[in-house]
UniProtKB/Swiss-Prot annotation:
This is Small ribosomal subunit protein uS19. It comes from Saccharopolyspora erythraea (strain ATCC 11635 / DSM 40517 / JCM 4748 / NBRC 13426 / NCIMB 8594 / NRRL 2338). Signal peptide: none annotated. HAMAP family: Ribosomal_uS19. GO terms for cellular component: cytoplasm; small ribosomal subunit. PANTHER family: RIBOSOMAL PROTEIN S19P FAMILY MEMBER, SMALL RIBOSOMAL SUBUNIT PROTEIN US19M. PROSITE patterns: RIBOSOMAL_S19 (PS00323). Belongs to the universal ribosomal protein uS19 family. GO terms for molecular function: rRNA binding; structural constituent of ribosome. Protein S19 forms a complex with S13 that binds strongly to the 16S ribosomal RNA.
Length: 93
């Protein structure tokens, strides 16, 4: 169920402060964050976020099509290496 419109999108306060400070100064530095739950808002356009995936920080450049999504959607937490092919020759021995 989506969030109520009267509440507005959720963005962590510390993250919003960092974005506002960079917008005022005009700098485009990487913002390191652990807040995967924060919604991407139009103020974040053009910024690069280093989103934590549990192991390392993944760089995510925000563009218009990402507005309304969560930061965590663009930093996958699981690495799928594929299924092992069944090797019949080694199984017989």
């Amino acid at each position: 169920m989506p969030r109520s419109l009267k509440k507005g999108p959720f963005v962590d306060d510390h993250l919003l402060k960092k974005v506002d400070a960079l917008n005022e100064s005009g700098k485009k530095t990487v913002i390191k964050t652990w807040s995967r739950r924060s919604t991407i808002i139009p103020d974040m356009l053009g910024h690069t976020f280093a989103v934590h995936d549990g192991r390392k920080h993944i760089p995510v450049f925000v563009n218009e099509s990402m507005v309304g999504h969560k930061l965590g959607e663009f930093a996958p937490t699981r690495t799928f290496k594929g299924h092992v092919k069944d090797d019949r020759k080694s199984r017989r021995r």
